[in-house]
Amino acid sequence: MLIPFALSPNIFNFEGLEQAEMEELLLQLNLLKMLIRTKGVVLIDSLGFLKNEIDGFIEDIPNQNIKRRTMEIFTDLAKNSFVEINTKELELEMEQYCRHFFSLLQQVPDIFAIYGNKNCTNFDCITCHSNMHIEKRTNLYYIMQINEEIMKRLVRSSIISINDYPLEDFKNEILKNLILYSKELYIFDNQMIPDIKEQNLEETAFDIKSNYKINLEYWMAYINEINPNLQVYLYLSVKLNQIKIKNEIKNKFIDFKKKLQKQIPSLNLKFRIIEESKEQGNIIITPHQRYFISDKIALSCDRGIDLLDRNHKLRDFNISLVNPKDKVMIKNYLEINSVLVNEK
């Protein structure tokens, strides 16, 4: 559900535009920002060439009000949505920034690429695109003609499956980009620790449920395969009637992680423990919904991480994109009310 974008620097080129045309382009840039901040990332070259070119176009905007508002859009995207990747400048007869732009298109087949404005006349993006034999599935759009496409993408904010949903499609369409373009991933599933009376009373030993062991093994391996540098935080949600066995719960997950690390030596997994509490009038209640929260977007998932059955067949599920403001609120609540587990 996370969409990778490539932005040609000349979408920020206001040269020669009348006031009404400037306002129209600014509106399109705002709509684009809304889409990216809701469910996307902007891929840029690690050398910073594209970013510098955008800076140059914005610096040349003659209208100070338009310039300020455009810079606000760019600054917001740079702060929250930029992801650097290594690119190789193409040796083609086109503008230098176009060579970096199309390099991104070649490297990332499912990228959503936005080009030009009416002043992009020296080189026609459509012609360049067709001459480069880039895969047809690449999305290439003119900045002034993306209203309809933006709305289509924004409308599709959830996926519900009650039938057989191919596992590979699920990974590619929903999880892959979330994992690939994020630095951190927080997984909150308050059903992962079962509320079993005999365990809570220490009459029987606590253990991780078998379905969660299956899913943790599978998804940690998949995450490591896609992005071995991704730092994963798994929340351990301890209810009021489980406080007595908190250490037992913590130790069981630490032991489980050690077993996982034998299969996945480079596993980047840490635990954060969150306890329900009503002490001194401070009521901490763990959220009912389950989440995958990255530094880019957040997904609400009714299954949590318990997505597969014992045969690795995908269960029915309902996954929704979380509003960016709600994402910040949820992430802050979980962080404030949890502590990092000391595994020593």
Task: List where the protein language model places each region.
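Structural motif
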Residues: 184-186, 297
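PLD/PLD-like phosphodiesterase catalytic module centered on the HKD motif
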Residues: 1-167, 172-175, 197-344
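N-terminal, charged amphipathic alpha-helical interaction modules
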Residues: 191-192, 196-197
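Secondary-structure "cap/kink" motif recognition
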Residues: 178-184
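Metal-dependent nucleic-acid phosphoesterase active-site entry motif
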Residues: 10, 190-191
